[in-house]
Amino acid sequence: SALWGLSLTISMLVVAVISPFLGALADYSGRKKTLLFVMTAISIVFTGLLFLVEKGDIFIGMLFFIIAEIGYRSGQVFYNSLLVDVADKDEIAKVSGNGWAIGSVGGIVCLLVVLVLIQLNPGNPFYIRLSLVITAVFYALFAIPAFLWIKEQHRPQKRDGKSLFKVAIER
């Protein structure tokens, strides 16, 4: 559990450092939905790859988890930036809350599925590892509506000749 905490700390520190750049990228690129897709795909792929991690594969397990978590948390930057494209200013909180609620329902359903699977096969590490593939599949399925239904309004802000890095630092 200490190594899981360390992995989470590393991933959150990376996201804290890169978030200003990601925010600038969201605001100035006009590609929020594409960037959300990339980060979501990274998170899904590396969550699924955790299936390959077996007992004793500590480094690779931590690495896959860190990358999956960075993809997930970085994706939230782009998810949040899309709120202005799907809701009026007075509806943003409601739309955001509903989005999180739907995602949470998917997470709870997934948890129940893998919990039953693991309980029916106690002590079998294969089913514990398989739960990560199932989680990746649920994640992908529950992400599909966002990519199908969200209509991004390409409104990249002007950088006035500044690099994204400089814009991110100056904000």
Which residues are covered by each model-predicted region?
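Central cavity-lining transmembrane alpha-helices of secondary-active solute carriers
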Residues: 4-24, 111
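Glycine-rich segments within core transmembrane alpha-helices of 12-TM secondary carriers
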Residues: 14, 93-117
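Cytoplasmic membrane-interface "Motif A"-like loop-to-helix N-cap segments
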Residues: 26-41
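C-terminal ends and interior cores of transmembrane alpha-helices
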Residues: 37-56
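Helix-loop junctions at membrane interfaces in 12-TM secondary transporters
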Residues: 51-65, 121
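Cytoplasmic helix-loop-helix junction between adjacent transmembrane helices
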Residues: 64-101
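C-terminal membrane-cytosol helix-exit motif in multi-pass small-molecule transporters
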Residues: 110-119, 136-156
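Juxtamembrane intracellular "pre-TM" segments in multi-pass secondary transporters
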Residues: 151-171
